[in-house]
UniProtKB/Swiss-Prot annotation:
Subcellular location field: Cell membrane
Transmembrane segments: 20-42, 52-74
Topology of the protein relative to the lipid bilayer: Multi-pass membrane protein
Protein name, as recorded: Uncharacterized protein AF_0085
Any GO CC annotation of this UniProt entry: plasma membrane
Alphabetical keyword list: Cell membrane, Membrane, Transmembrane, Transmembrane helix
């Protein structure tokens, strides 16, 4: 029982770390966030309060409604490991809301963060799905 628990945890950790390290969109997301903060510190932050409020609403809507929905519809058979892997990897990519100047962050983040992270999520969903199919076929033999 203990060995099985350790193996399960190790497998889920491997699924979580591997996509984070090998996927180019993840690197793009993190680099884009850092670049946006450099622009912010340099003073190139447009101060559009209406845009800030609109982006804040859409960010919360995307993060707390659409993303969990996408994660749990990737596979309907209740594969906990893959759901956990996708969610954990995604949360590593998504930058904290309250770091840096929020006005600058929300002005740039739609172009710098959401497009690459969406590509990453779709790519990772299919990649993990193929991995799970392969591992389930091996276990049936």
């Amino acid at each position: 029982m203990v060995a099985r628990t350790i193996a399960t945890f190790a497998g889920s950790t491997a699924l979580t770390i591997k996509p984070f390290l090998v996927n180019l969109p993840v690197v793009i997301c993190l680099a884009a966030y850092l670049v946006s903060q450099v622009f912010c510190l340099a003073g190139f932050c447009p101060d559009y309060l209406a845009e800030l409020h609109l982006c804040t609403f859409f960010t919360f809507f995307t993060s707390f409604l659409l993303v969990p929905l996408a994660i749990f519809t990737l596979r309907k058979d209740g594969n906990f490991l893959r759901k956990r892997a996708v969610f954990t990897s995604y949360s590593c990519v998504y930058p904290p809301f309250r770091l840096g100047n929020p006005t600058c962050f929300y002005s740039y983040h739609w172009f710098l963060i959401h497009i690459p992270e969406s590509l990453w999520l779709v790519n990772n969903g299919f990649g993990l799905r193929a991995t799970c199919r392969l591992s389930s076929r091996r276990s049936q033999r």
